[in-house]
């Protein structure tokens, strides 16, 4: 329906501060928690079909040519696109598609996004930076750290790479991936900070970020990912008065207690819309 959207004057950014058209969501690849993401190296598990350790996940439905066409069509229409992709092998296909689209039709400040980008490498992140993409990374280690076991401990340091992406200057946005993990921002922030599961196991401590950085990812990072950093993401003169009042300072409490912080008040557009006990 891209033609119909364009004919109606609709596109990424259309709307107002309450309701706005965002990116087009696309899928390329499979699931991290379902152990179906497509990888270059095999999972650290036995392939139930062969009895061998030769399971690489499930290849995407789209061929490279089909993916190239999809990304270019959305890009040419002037939309931002956010593409679900988890495994390093499927992400590499996606980067190839973005590279071709941008070479064919250069566009500055496109902010195309990869949703999840769960298993990567330094080389993949370098391409992400060069293509000026935004990463919307998982923060669900608290509930789903055990799902990372199938990928092998050697890979944990290159999964959900918030630390490395930030250090490289790649824009990172926070999210709950609700439906897979709970839409509880303070729990999500704790997960970014500790990389520790509910059972107390740490997965990839190299990718921990500070509470201050995690808050920024969830505020300014998320606002940037939808072209709203000039009106949202921080409390400043000239921006919308959207903020929450917390029961404690997440930068001051023990990191394993961040999840217990509650919302005392929510203010939207300068008006109180929620007050807790």
Please describe what each predicted stretch is.
Residues 72-82, 89-112, 116-117, 122-126, ...:
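His/Asp/Glu-enriched, well-ordered alpha-helical/loop segment
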Residues 276-277:
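Extracellular/periplasmic ectodomains of large secreted or surface enzymes and adhesion receptors
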């Amino acid at each position: 329906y891209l033609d119909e959207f364009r004919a109606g004057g609709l596109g990424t950014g259309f709307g107002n501060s309450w309701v706005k058209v965002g990116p087009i969501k696309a899928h390329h690849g499979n699931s991290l928690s379902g152990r179906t993401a497509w990888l270059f190296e095999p999972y650290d598990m036995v392939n139930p079909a062969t009895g061998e350790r030769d399971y690489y996940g499930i290849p995407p439905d789209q061929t490279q040519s089909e993916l190239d066409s999809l990304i270019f069509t959305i890009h040419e229409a002037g939309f931002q696109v956010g593409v679900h992709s988890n495994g390093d092998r499927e992400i590499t296909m996606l980067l190839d598609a973005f590279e071709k689209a941008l070479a064919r039709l250069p566009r500055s400040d496109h902010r195309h996004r990869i949703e999840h980008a769960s298993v990567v490498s330094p080389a993949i992140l370098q391409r992400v930076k060069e293509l000026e993409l935004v990463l919307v990374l998982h923060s669900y280690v608290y509930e789903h750290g055990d799902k990372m076991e199938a990928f092998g401990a050697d890979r944990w340091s290159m999964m959900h790479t918030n630390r490395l992406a930030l250090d490289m200057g790649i824009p990172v946005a926070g999210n709950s991936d609700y439906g897979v993990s709970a839409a509880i921002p303070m729990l999500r922030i704790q997960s970014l900070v500790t990389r520790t599961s509910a059972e107390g196991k740490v997965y990839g401590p190299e990718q921990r970020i500070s509470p201050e950085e995690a808050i920024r990812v969830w505020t300014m990072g998320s606002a940037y990912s939808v072209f709203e950093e000039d009106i949202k993401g921080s409390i400043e003169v000239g921006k919308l008065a959207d903020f929450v009042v917390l029961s404690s300072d997440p930068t001051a409490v023990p990191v394993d207690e961040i999840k217990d912080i509650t919302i005392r008040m929510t203010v939207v557009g300068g008006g109180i819309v929620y007050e807790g006990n």
